[in-house]
Structure formats: structure tokens, C-alpha cells
Amino acid sequence: MLSTRFPRPPGDVGHPGSWRGDTEFRVVEGAGPRDAVRDAAGLREGPVLAAFSAAARELEANGVGAITTSCGFLVLLQEALQDAVKVPVVTSSLLLLPALLAREPQVGVLTIDARHLGDAHLRQAGVPPGQLADVMVEGVDPGGEFARAILGNDAAMDLARAGRDVVAAARALRGRAPRLRTVVLECTNMPPYAQAIRDATGFEVLSLADVPALKSWAAEPMIRG
């Protein structure tokens, strides 16, 4: 997990109630939200990748059955972290995209920062070059409560306002792509608002909990929102 202090309600990847059974959380010190989102390429160099790899090895040594991360932008570390351990590693919900694109002409992605989620992330998730344009990315308002609290790593967050930001982004995506059926939540802090997104847009909403390697561990708050 990134080193954070913002609230994590049920459904958030960092809330213990989001998972079934025993869950071990390991914080990678020195890696905060902005590091992952706005300098993601830098994560593949220097001490941060080494710290994530070491944390993954420690979790594996403790007997975990699978490992995930707390930020979808960390898909850029997918290969390196999987190479570091033998247990399944799921860095991001974006790994769902190739299978979805095989059955649907377009798939939506809701992200905390549309300005920085680019083709490199989609390619690393396995999206074929010819289908990059079929991924419809929509970000929350960069000046809204959701982005402010999480990217700013603020200990205080108005959850109702944050939820409205996420739903507003989903509605904007629906307006851009009225025939879109499915949306993937890049941000692991968005699942608490999944049901509100469904109610507002009719989208099928998928998240980290829907990745096959993690699905059996996901609890109801993360599945339904």
C-alpha cells in the first residue's frame, strides 16, 4: 500500500472489511499518492520499486495467497512485482480491460486523474495497441473533494462530497458514450461509491474485486459499494 492518511470507508482497498478472512496490509514508506499518480514512470526506477518488491517478498514469506496494491496507476509495476514473487500479483483493476475489450466495442475507465492515466498504463495492462482508442477514460474533477483529499493525502475528507465527484465523472462518461455498458474503476478508493454509480448511470461497474485472482477474497462492501 501507498503511505496514506486519508479516510478509507468500507469498500476501499485499505479497509479491512473490504476483504474476506485474514488480510495483511504492508505500507511502502516514502511512496504517497502523488508519487504513484503524477510520477508513475519514476516508480520503475530508483528505491521505490525496490521497496515495493521487498514488501511483496515479505508478504509472500508470510504465506499470503495473492498480493494487490492500493493504486491502479501501479499497473506500471505489474511485471516487475510479479517477477519478484511466485504468488499472483494484481497491481490494478486495469488488468480487466483486455478481456472486456474482447467482448465489448468500448470500455470506460473512471480515474482519479485523467491527465496522467495514459497509453503506457493501458499497454501495461495488456490492451492491444489497436484498441487503445476503445478505452474511454474519464477523471474526477481535479479541484473536487475526492481528488483534493486523496492526492493531497489529507486526513479529512467529506465522503458525501467525494462520492458526488465520482458520480459526476460517471455521468460525464455516460454523456460522452451513451452506448457504453461497462466501466472499470481505476482508483481503489472508488468502490465505496460503486452502487451510486450504477444507480446514476446504469453502468456495469467493475473494480479490483472483479479480477479473477482476487475475487474469492473480496467482501460485500468492495463488491457492491
Model-derived features: where do they sit?
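C-terminal functional extensions of proteins
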Residues: E186, M190-P192, L206-G225
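Glycine-rich, highly charged phosphate/nucleotide-binding loops
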Residues: A40-E58, R161-A169
